[in-house]
Amino acid sequence: MRKRARIIYNPTSGKEQFKRELPDALIKLEKAGYETSAYATEKIGDATLEAERAMHENYDVLIAAGGDGTLNEVVNGIAEKPNRPKLGVIPMGTVNDFGRALHIPNDIMGALDVIIEGHSTKVDIGKMNNRYFINLAAGGQLTQVSYETPSKLKSIVGPFAYYIKGFEMLPQMKAVDLRIEYDGNVFQGEALLFFLGLTNSMAGFEKLVPDAKLDDGYFTLIIVEKSNLAELGHIMTLASRGEHTKHPKVIYEKAKAINISSLTDLQLNVDGEYGGKLPANFLNLERHIDVFAPNDIVNEELISNDHVDDNLIEE
């Protein structure tokens, strides 16, 4: 019996490239043995609703084609359900943090090859209050860059748009008083930023979590304490090389459960999109989603040795 795949795609991502190549993508998957159909989103929330519908119709594979926001919506549509379908990813956004972390090719046909080859691995996801995320949750003024950067600027200069907007915001940054409880520990004090990471790639920084494991059941918690502009600039430079973890203004920890609160009105960034405001409870859901990935992520030590799946090893 042929497997059934449903593509959920954002037609505006990647300068509408996927929309143009959709017929070729459908043919490629059909030739590989998948009975395939597609759905184009029109507004925020569409991908979640369509993922839920596809679950009810018992699709074997869901393929998210778009940016990290589209992928986040698809995950939110299946995370609470039993017998979740395998997830394929076609990175079409500006940064594509999750795709980078899993070494998924940025070209459409290359990403489809990963799905067709059939290797998959189970990865952790995060639950924040009543919603889910697959890559990061963050707070602090600088973390608003991804959803405050104009779409036109992103279409012109791509990922560099975030750096342009980020440097524009640096002088305006202010520390806020936070209480962060994590696995029996407490941080109470002023901080500029905090990140909860599930992969090594966050906000375009591919070495922000140099020791990342995608399936160990832990968030990486990064807190940047109150710093002056020069210190913050130095931390960002170190972060581009993965050398920030020992900086005296950086707290770098692992935790399964985290609670964050503040008397300040602080917005959250969840997988690159606006995620509401504090307070927030975070829980790591270990190995919750099965994702198609290239076989080489095992060699990159992104998967825990005791969790290597049989279908991620060449026979």
Swiss-Prot record:
An example Pfam family from this entry, by short name, is: DAGK_cat
Domain of life according to the entry = Bacteria
Where along this sequence does the record place binding of ATP? 10-14, 41, 67-73, 94
Q: GO molecular function terms here?
A: ATP binding; ATP-dependent diacylglycerol kinase activity; metal ion binding
Keywords noted in UniProt: ATP-binding, Kinase, Lipid biosynthesis, Lipid metabolism, Magnesium, Metal-binding, Nucleotide-binding, Phospholipid biosynthesis, Phospholipid metabolism, Transferase
Entry's PROSITE patterns?
DAGK
Q: Which residues form the DAGKc domain?
A: 1-132
Q: Does the keyword Coiled coil apply?
A: no
Q: Identify the cofactor(s).
A: Mg(2+)
UniProt family annotation: Belongs to the diacylglycerol/lipid kinase family.
Give the multimer and partner information. Homodimer.
Question: What role is this protein assigned?
Answer: Catalyzes the phosphorylation of diacylglycerol (DAG) into phosphatidic acid. Is a key enzyme involved in the production of lipoteichoic acid by reintroducing DAG formed from the breakdown of membrane phospholipids into the phosphatidylglycerol biosynthetic pathway.
Q: What is this protein called?
A: Diacylglycerol kinase
**Species for this entry:** Staphylococcus aureus (strain bovine RF122 / ET3-1)
